[in-house]
Amino acid sequence: MSTVLITGTSTGIGRATAETLLSQGHTVYATMRDAEGRDATAASQLGEFAASRPGTLRIAGLDVTSQASADAAVQRVIDEAGHLDVVVHNAGHLFVGYTEAFTEDDLTRLLDVNAVGAHRVNRAALPHLRGRRSGTLVYVGSTILVTTPPFLGPYVASKAAFDALAVVTSYEVSQFGIETSIVMPGAIPHGTNHFSGASRASDAQVTAAYADLDALVARTNEAHDGLFDPERPADPQSVADEVARILTLPEGCKPFRSVVDAARAGVDHVMAFSDLTREAFVRRLGFEEVLELKR
């Protein structure tokens, strides 16, 4: 079994992933931004769940907008467990509204959480993984960088940046025996606080200028609900199950990308072609080594 650090485990996909891995016997460092404050209830509930499972749970505070926080969380894993095998990048936040109405601070803040946050955690974890010449980075991304729905502009941009960072980082860390898997969930309107906890644009004056579109924005949740077969609803558990499945695969056999999309938007086909095109270009450049795991 592996020692796994997961970001953003208070709700949704992160919570389901922590529970699934605990049920399989892994040692899980379930991190939350404020485990002793606003996330204390979630931490307590996860602790109660873990009490009857074969895995070992450790709750840790981790704010992905702070390098010091990321460093401290990873160092705690090393100090207590002796090693770190897997990092699951899951922490993220949603903004809904008119793109023009998001200030530069709004956009910077979302990119900081959804993209730069994973980079901070990598900077904390990779020295240990490189030293062992093994490990796995799992990125919980989104199909949204392909489907690009309206009224979610900054979120789309942040998830595209997150995906790009995952790809370019994979080239380099593969040469130290570190695998990368990007799991791309489709929309999951229920079972998370993603939509209910979404932030809005700060510029009220610009937002008011788009008032004619307010009725469309109000349909965002309904529109996403309509994507799914009532018999096959989108569920955070389906994503958690895929992360868990990937971690059971032998070294060198983990998929670089896996799409988990109950909406069946065809993103798997798009990304398969995109990755083939990217890999072909990297080979044309003469850097084919970075596409292979160096053991």
Q: Where would I find each of the regions flagged by the language model?
A:
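Active-site loop of short-chain dehydrogenase/reductase
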Residues: 2, 83-84, 129-143, 176-179
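Conserved glycine-rich cofactor-binding loop
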Residues: 10-11
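The beta1-alpha1 cofactor-binding region of Rossmann-like NAD(H)/NADP(H)-dependent oxidoreductases
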Residues: 37, 61-72, 104
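A glycine-rich helix->loop->beta "capping" turn
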Residues: 54-56, 76-89, 95
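Substrate-binding pocket helix/loop in short-chain dehydrogenase/reductase
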Residues: 98-99, 106-108
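Active-site helix of classical SDR
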Residues: 122, 158-161
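SDR active-site lid
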Residues: 175-254
